[in-house]
Amino acid sequence: MNPAENYTYRYLETDDLDQYNALLRYTFQVTEDELTATGWKDDEIKQSKFPVLERADVLGCFDGENLVSQFAVYPLKMNIYDAVYHVGFVTSVCTYPEYTGNGIMKRLMIQGLTQMHKEGKSFALLYPYSIPLYHHLGWEIISNKISYNIKDRQIPTKVSAPGYVRRVAWDNTEFHELHSHFASITHGCLFRNALAWEEYWRWDEDDTNVAVYYNVKDKPCGYMVYLIKNDIMHIKEMIYLNREAQKGLWEYIHAHDSMIDEVHSNTYFSEPIAFEIDDGDIKETIRPYAMGRIVDVASFLEDYPCDPDGGELCIDLEIEDDLLPWNDHTFRIRFADGGCTLTDAPAEYHLKMGIGTLSTLLLGYKTAERLFELERIEGREDAVERLDDVLFHKIPYISDYI
């Protein structure tokens, strides 16, 4: 008999905080030295986790009274091609080593995704610790993170903007509202609620700064969050609503050239920045970032936008999902007039794919043509071409790690 069948599965409460914290600390090896380096004391990190248990759904597996595995889902909103989706960000996925291999995590994931299905959350995302493991459970890569280093002499010098930059406090209202505006116009971006902002700042040092770019009408149009340490400017995040704000922030970075030797930063636009600067001989490293999974295909398609210029298409998509049975069948979909609906009308084409492939396709990370070339989609090539015609193709911007 599988020992996992004798364990108890339930949602955590605030009384479970000590065990929740201990499991996180052990699994992710957060040491006292690391806490001290970022200004945290053990009792403070425990206290800061109260909102997680209060506002997120944390499902745990107990061996007797002992918490041995957990799976947390943060409720968030996400921009998918300008449609706002209620999604779940899966995090704090961890199990004590002696309990691995018993199917505990798979069972927790099924229960967690089933609860999302009941709550109307049709999409889930996470930052993976093991891409092969999540592949096996129907997840797929949906975004990239590009890290880059720029030497002081390579910082753009021929940029200027008519506005100005001001440093503001971490809790500045304009700063938070600016991110909300950015999220509303950026495919893939998450809307940060109070809990997401708390997690955003959790490990930052006290010397971390926020600089906001304002245009000549005093309207905030961009910001950067950064720390200067050991002659390096570490930029945690830089977003902008337009080219003017982007230039204004680079001008602000250049103003620090006498204080720093290098700039280290990341971009989540999946577009290398070397082309944008005069001296593009820089080091850039690309790696997969977020993974995603459609929780409920039928519900996801209800609000899914498509290209109104792609014409009308009626197609059968045969989806394989070994984890969630309500997704494991054929969906007949009509794409027309910028939207899609399930239909009983005769289908022109038929394609077959797994739930992970469908997820990365509809999020825009890969085209149907590329997935077909990789043998991730089965069917006729003309069907693949028509499907690409009706879909938008833009890689999601996902920068949050919760």
Regions found by a protein language model. Name each.
Residues 1-75, 82, 89, 155-195, ...:
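Short amphipathic alpha-helix that is part of the acyltransferase structural core
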Residues 90-100, 232-243:
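A short, internal acetyl-CoA/4′-phosphopantetheine-binding micro-motif in the GNAT/acyltransferase core
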Residues 109, 114-128, 258-268:
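Conserved GNAT acetyl-CoA-binding A-motif
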Residues 139-159, 236-402:
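Active-site/acyl-donor-binding loops of N-acyltransferases
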